[in-house]
Each structure stands twice: as structure tokens, then as C-alpha cells.
């Protein structure tokens, strides 16, 4: 069974100001990768005594005074995972976004599509590297 080094970056902007946005690193090893088999990994511990979500990273949305042109970026830096999957088995990693409030989220861009120096466009990615044993 292999180990994997995972890193990610998520960039974008939501339509509601002053909100917290959370991301979760997800692993799925089931055949066909059904959503019901998603497992959050590399998350904080809520103590299992409350309903607070356990997340991997967090960041704040834009400020009220700059409501449509400030992209945010957060990172998951170098998490080592041991999924107990045999070589050639089913393995999927992905990043989930969790929004504090109901809003539209624009991935890799700001809310308004500006053709000017203040319109932001940044990438999002997940990198997975197998660690030689």
C-alpha cells in the first residue's frame, strides 16, 4: 500500500461579502466514487460533541467596499495520506468547498468579469504525488 503527498490551492470569490469559506480534502476509494463514500481527511477535530463542520482550511470572502473584484485563495500544504489501497485500486482525491451562507461561488475568478487590471483570475489545483516505499 502506497502513501501519497497531497497539496491543493482553491481560488475564487463568492457573491456575499464578509463570509468565511471552508475547504475539505476528500478521499474516495469506492468503485465508481459515489458521493456517499467521500471521507474528509486532514481536518480539524470538533470534539465530536457539536455539529460544527470539520474542515481542512478556511478563508474570508471579500470586504463590503470591494464587493466583486477581489479573488481569495487558500492552500492545503503537503498532507501525507495512507489510504490502504492496493496498487491499481480505486482512489480519488478532491477538494470540497463549504460556504457559510447561501451564495454563488465563482471558481478561479472574481464575481464580475472585468477586462481591466483589477479583475482577478487565479488557478485552482490538486497535486497528488505517490511516495516511493
Q: What residue ranges belong to the model's regions?
A:
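Terminal beta-strand-rich extracellular "head" domains
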Residues: 3, 7-90, 94-133
Amino acid at each position: 500500500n502506497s502513501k501519497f503527498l497531497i497539496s491543493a490551492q482553491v481560488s475564487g470569490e463568492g457573491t456575499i461579502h464578509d463570509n468565511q469559506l471552508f475547504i475539505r480534502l476528500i478521499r474516495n476509494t469506492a468503485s465508481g466514487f459515489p458521493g456517499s463514500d467521500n471521507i474528509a481527511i486532514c481536518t480539524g477535530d470538533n470534539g465530536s460533541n457539536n455539529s460544527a463542520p470539520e474542515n481542512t482550511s478556511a478563508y474570508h470572502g471579500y470586504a463590503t467596499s470591494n464587493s466583486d473584484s477581489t479573488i481569495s485563495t487558500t492552500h492545503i500544504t503537503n498532507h501525507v495520506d495512507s489510504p490502504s489501497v492496493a496498487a491499481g485500486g480505486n482512489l480519488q482525491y478532491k477538494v470540497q468547498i463549504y460556504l457559510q451562507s447561501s451564495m454563488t461561488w465563482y471558481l478561479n475568478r472574481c464575481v464580475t468579469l472585468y477586462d481591466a487590471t483589477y479583475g482577478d483570475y487565479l488557478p485552482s489545483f490538486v497535486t497528488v504525488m505517490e511516495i516511493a516505499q
